[in-house]
A protein has these predicted regions:
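PP2C/PPM-type serine/threonine phosphatase catalytic domain
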Residues: 1-229
Length: 229
């Protein structure tokens, strides 16, 4: 297993509210967590950093418990500190052990699997526009430029309880898992993500994708973690 990660402020934002952490555990286990904060400059950064810190401490536990613990910490902080009221963050937390991928997420940060068959989005966006697409009110193409595209329906820290999606699958040799914030997916097409990660130079994947997002406008913070199996 190989892992590489990077975050970038982008070309427009004045601060970076994204956060990530990644690492390896004994026995060939690798893990990563990516968060995209919201709630103003102070609150968004605190929310995403708190989620990452809690995940870092508890990654050996089940991922669902990790995310629930992070949610409680962010929510309590939001309620007790006036300047942080309303803060929250997306989260994607992943762990790979013995070819098994375990994934938990909330919000519109994404995970992709890149294999010999192509690229597959593993997460479903918890967003207003995704709900509209699924109800036939928008096409995927219309959703990209919709004025409500950045409104998410799930986030850590918004309420005392958090509903997450859980995914598990067996990986094949050569597979790559990409975890990213919408600073990448709003500016780089899925096919371009695939084309940028098809060779064996895994250590370049995060740089390549962030560079693509910045070349296409870089209108948001960009965070990418690549886990190559």
């Amino acid at each position: 297993m190989k892992i590489v990660a990077k975050t970038d402020q982008g070309k427009v934002r004045k601060d970076n509210q994204d956060s990530f952490a990644a690492g390896e555990l004994p026995g060939g286990v690798v893990w990563a967590v990516v968060c995209d904060g919201m709630g103003g400059a102070a609150g968004g950064s605190v929310a995403s950093q708190t989620a990452v810190k809690m995940s870092d401490r508890s990654i050996k536990n089940l991922l669902t418990s990790v995310v629930e613990n992070a949610n409680s910490s962010i929510y309590e902080m939001s309620c007790s500190v006036e300047s942080l009221n309303g803060m929250g963050t997306t989260v994607v937390a992943a762990m790979i052990r013995d070819r098994e991928l375990y994934l938990v997420h909330a919000g519109d940060s994404r995970a992709y699997r890149i294999s010999q068959e192509g690229i597959t989005q593993l997460t479903r966006d918890h967003s207003v526009v995704q709900d509209m697409v699924e109800h036939g009110e928008l096409t995927q193409e219309q959703a990209k430029d919709h004025p409500r595209k950045n409104i998410i329906t799930r986030a850590l820290g918004v309420s005392a309880d958090i509903e997450t999606d859980y995914y598990q699958d067996t990986l094949d040799e050569g597979d790559v898992i990409i975890i990213c914030t919408d600073g990448l997916t709003n500016y780089v097409e899925t096919d371009d993500i695939y084309n940028a990660t098809r060779d064996n130079h895994y250590y370049e994947f995060a740089d390549r994708l962030i560079n693509l997002a910045n070349e296409n406008g870089g209108g948001d913070n960009i965070t990418v973690v690549a886990m190559a199996f």
